[in-house]
């Protein structure tokens, strides 16, 4: 299986998202999967959307890029949206809107906590809490 992780790996200390992406990529490769960090390849089986802020230096793609990929390259790719952020967590006023929009391209949502899943923001499609 070919899996695209929406994260630009960073060298050195960069935070939890970077550690998550590095660990996930290593585990997937150990299990025989191919891992890429962009949407240039036409035969991606699974897209992991990890960052909704398009201008973030850690984002290798965002929801708009995923939507274009599904429309013009590979409509069979499955999209999983990893959600670990919200306005309530940091007192911001923009993340919920970005997350809600991005969530529309997802076939499945993975929440890092049940408290995130309980917020009235998400499509009520397939979801998991880790």
For the regions a language model picked out, list residue spans one by one.
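N-terminal pre-catalytic "stem/leader" segment of glycosyltransferase-like enzymes
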Residues: 1-54
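A short, active-site helix/loop in glycosyltransferases that binds the activated sugar's phosphate group
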Residues: 104-129
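Extended catalytic core of nucleotide-activated donor transferases of GT-like folds
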Residues: 36, 40-105, 115
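Short aromatic-enriched loop/helix-cap "lid" or pocket-rim segments at secondary-structure transitions
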Residues: 15-19, 61, 92-95, 123
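Active-site phosphate/pyrophosphate- and oxyanion-stabilizing loops and adjacent acidic/basic residues
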Residues: 22, 26, 100, 118
């Amino acid at each position: 299986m070919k899996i695209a992780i929406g994260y630009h790996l960073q060298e050195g200390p960069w935070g939890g998202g970077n550690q998550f992406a590095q660990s996930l990529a290593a585990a997937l490769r150990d299990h025989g999967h191919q891992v890429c960090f962009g949407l240039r390849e036409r035969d991606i089986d699974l897209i992991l959307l990890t960052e909704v802020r398009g201008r973030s230096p850690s984002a290798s793609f965002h929801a708009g890029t995923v939507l274009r990929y599904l429309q013009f390259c590979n409509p069979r790719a499955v999209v999983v949206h990893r959600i670990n952020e919200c306005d309530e967590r940091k007192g911001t006023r923009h993340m919920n809107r970005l997350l809600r929009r991005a969530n529309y391209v997802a076939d499945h949502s993975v929440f890092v906590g049940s408290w995130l899943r309980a917020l009235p923001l998400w499509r009520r499609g397939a979801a998991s809490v880790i």
